[in-house]
Amino acid sequence: MKTSQLLYDPVIHKLKLLEEHDVTPLLNELSAPKKPTIVGFLNQHGYNLIQQDERARRHFLQVNYLLRDGIGIKLACALNGLEPGANLNGTDFIPALIEHALHSERGEQYQLFAMGTCEPWTSQGASALFGGRSFHAIDGFQPLEDYLQFVQQHLEPGKIPLIVMGMGMPRQEEVAVRLQRQLGRPALMICGGAILDFAAQRFNRAPAAIRKIGMEWAYRLLMEPRRLFARYVIGIPQFFYYIVRNGRDGNVDVSEQGAYNRKS
């Protein structure tokens, strides 16, 4: 459904926007990948990154399923005449997706990988997400090529790789795109930000009431002001500048590969 449109931002129009009743069909679809498939999330921070780094834009927008995460993108959708639908933030959606996939008809075919953060959080988070099933884990501070080799070395014939990447934006999107090119089989790659840390309970979630009104970012800023000051206090005004600039600039397009570009 569309609302009254003030702007047209091609990046926002690339989102897969869903209502709550569409979530279960999406989980079914993602649980039966027919090719190497990337799931990712666009929030205010990610939107800023893809304005500032051309390579990040290219990788980020090659994600097959780019989902709306947060109140900032909700407002951007409204300005672009789009019904924002459900807020599919990764911290809630990813555990639901993994549980759904592992209990689907293909559940026993999945081979599980976790990439990101550092030990013991990598293994603790993976164990929580994967329900105690066996998995292969590697921290998030290795050269990019090491992740490609890590997956290739551990792949088993006939298995479907399910790879959770918790390296943060935009590195995890770059790794996912490289793996997508390398894997010649169905696979599910999930760009999860701090999902392994949250699953390991390294960081606390905001109370449910705060999450419900879309203000978890403010809670996180309060808990980690030094680390998140630039992301939110500086980043939020930047975000609205980019939204308005891109929505009004006729020299903006999206290539067939999904990359955001500015025409010369």
Per-region residue spans from a language model:
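Short, flexible loop segments at boundaries between secondary-structure elements
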Residues: D139-D146, R185-M223
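N-terminal nucleotide/polyanion-binding subdomain common to many enzyme families
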Residues: M1-I94
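A contiguous pocket-lining binding segment that forms or flanks enzyme active sites
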Residues: Y147-P186
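A transmembrane-helix-recognition feature enriched in membrane-embedded lipid enzymes
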Residues: K74-C77, R205-G258
